[in-house]
C-alpha cells in the first residue's frame, strides 16, 4: 500500500511532505526512514531537481542564442534581452567600468537558476510526489531545491570560494593575509582581535546568503503544505491562490537578493588593498 492510499492525519501529512528522498552513501540504497541528521545521507531529490532545472536553463538559453536575430526580436528574445540588460546594468552600477568579464554571466546564471528553483514552490504540493509514487513507488519526495539548506549552503559556498579567489588574485596572498591580521586595528597587539573580527565578517557572508534564501523559500513551502494538510480540498483554493500570488514576489525577490549580494561581495573582493595595511 502506497502512502497515498493511506489515511493520514494532518500531522502525518505535513511531516510526510517535509521529508526528502535520501540515499545512504555507505550502501548506495534508498533510505527507508528519513533522517536529516546523518552525515552519510544525501537528499537526492534536491540534487536531481537542481541539476534538472540547471540543464533546462542551459538548453533554453542555448536555443535562444541560436535563434537570435538582429532585426525585430520575438517576444521571448525581447524578454531575454531585457533580463540580460537589467542584470548588466546592476553589475555596472556596482562595479563601474572595471567589471570582470565573468561577473555578468555568473550573475545571470545565479538569478535564473535560483528563480527556477524557487518557482517549483508554486507547483501543487501533491502533484509531482503523487506521480513519482504512482510510477516509481517513491514515498517521499520534495521538489523545491532551494528549500533544502544543503543546496542553498552549497551555492553560497561556491560564491565564498569565488570571493577568496578574486581577493587573493587581486591583492596577492601576502596582502590578503595581512588584512586579516591588521584590519580594522593596525596594531600588532590587536592581531587576535582583528583575526576574530575578520573571520566572522568573512564567514557571515555565505551563512547569511544561504540562510536568507532557505528561510524564505522553506517557510513559503511550509505554508502551502499547511494549507493542503489542514483544510479540505474545496477550501484550500481560498488561501492557496492569494498566497501563491504573493509568493511570486518572494520567488523573484529572493533570487534577486542572492544575485545582488553576490555581485557586491565580489566587488568588495576586487577592491584595491588598503595602503595603511602593514
Curated annotation (Swiss-Prot):
Main location: membrane
Membrane-spanning intervals of the chain: 41-61, 108-128, 149-168, 180-200, 222-242, 244-264
Cellular component GO terms, alphabetical: plasma membrane; proton-transporting ATP synthase complex
Gene Ontology terms describing biological process: proton motive force-driven plasma membrane ATP synthesis
Keyword Transport: yes
InterPro entries: ATP_syn_F0_a_bact/chloroplast (IPR045082), ATP_synth_F0_asu (IPR000568), ATP_synth_F0_asu_AS (IPR023011), F0_ATP_A_sf (IPR035908)
Subcellular location as annotated: Cell membrane
The organism's place on the tree of life at top rank: Bacteria
Keywords recorded for this protein, A-Z: ATP synthesis, Cell membrane, CF(0), Hydrogen ion transport, Ion transport, Membrane, Transmembrane, Transmembrane helix, Transport
GO molecular function terms attached to this record: proton-transporting ATP synthase activity, rotational mechanism
Membrane topology type: Multi-pass membrane protein
Function per UniProt: Key component of the proton channel; it plays a direct role in the translocation of protons across the membrane.
Subunit structure: F-type ATPases have 2 components, CF(1) - the catalytic core - and CF(0) - the membrane proton channel. CF(1) has five subunits: alpha(3), beta(3), gamma(1), delta(1), epsilon(1). CF(0) has three main subunits: a(1), b(2) and c(9-12). The alpha and beta chains form an alternating ring which encloses part of the gamma chain. CF(1) is attached to CF(0) by a central stalk formed by the gamma and epsilon chains, while a peripheral stalk is formed by the delta and b chains.
UniProt similarity note: Belongs to the ATPase A chain family.
NCBIfam families for this protein: ATP_synt_6_or_A, PRK05815.1-1
UniProt protein name: ATP synthase subunit a
Species this chain originates from: Wigglesworthia glossinidia brevipalpis
Organism lineage string: Bacteria, Pseudomonadati, Pseudomonadota, Gammaproteobacteria, Enterobacterales
Amino acid at each position: 500500500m502506497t502512502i497515498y492510499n493511506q489515511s493520514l492525519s494532518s500531522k502525518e501529512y505535513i511531516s510526510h511532505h517535509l521529508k526528502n528522498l535520501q540515499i545512504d552513501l555507505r550502501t548506495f540504497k534508498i533510505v527507508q526512514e528519513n533522517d536529516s541528521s546523518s552525515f552519510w545521507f544525501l537528499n537526492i531529490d534536491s540534487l536531481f531537481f537542481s541539476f534538472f532545472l540547471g540543464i533546462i536553463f542551459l538548453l533554453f538559453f542555448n536555443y535562444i542564442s541560436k535563434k537570435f536575430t538582429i532585426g525585430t526580436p520575438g517576444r521571448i528574445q525581447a524578454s531575454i534581452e531585457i533580463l540580460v540588460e537589467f542584470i548588466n546594468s546592476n553589475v555596472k552600477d556596482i562595479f563601474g567600468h572595471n567589471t570582470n568579464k565573468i561577473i555578468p554571466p555568473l550573475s545571470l546564471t545565479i538569478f535564473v537558476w535560483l528563480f527556477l528553483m524557487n518557482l517549483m514552490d508554486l507547483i501543487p504540493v501533491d502533484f509531482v510526489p503523487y506521480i513519482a509514487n504512482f510510477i516509481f513507488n517513491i514515498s517521499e519526495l520534495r521538489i523545491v531545491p532551494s528549500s533544502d539548506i544543503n543546496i542553498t549552503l552549497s551555492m553560497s559556498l561556491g560564491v565564498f570560494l569565488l570571493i577568496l579567489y578574486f581577493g587573493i588574485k587581486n591583492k596577492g596572498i601576502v596582502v590578503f593575509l595581512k588584512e586579516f591580521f591588521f584590519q580594522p586595528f593596525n596594531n600588532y597587539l590587536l592581531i587576535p582581535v582583528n583575526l576574530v573580527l575578520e573571520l566572522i565578517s568573512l564567514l557571515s557572508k555565505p551563512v547569511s546568503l544561504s540562510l536568507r534564501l532557505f528561510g524564505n523559500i522553506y517557510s513559503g513551502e511550509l505554508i502551502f503544505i499547511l494549507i493542503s494538510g489542514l483544510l479540505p480540498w474545496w477550501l484550500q483554493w481560498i488561501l492557496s491562490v492569494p498566497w501563491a500570488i504573493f509568493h511570486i514576489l518572494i520567488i523573484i525577490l529572493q533570487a534577486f537578493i542572492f544575485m545582488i549580494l553576490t555581485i557586491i561581495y565580489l566587488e568588495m573582493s576586487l577592491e584595491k588593498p588598503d595602503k595603511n595595511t602593514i
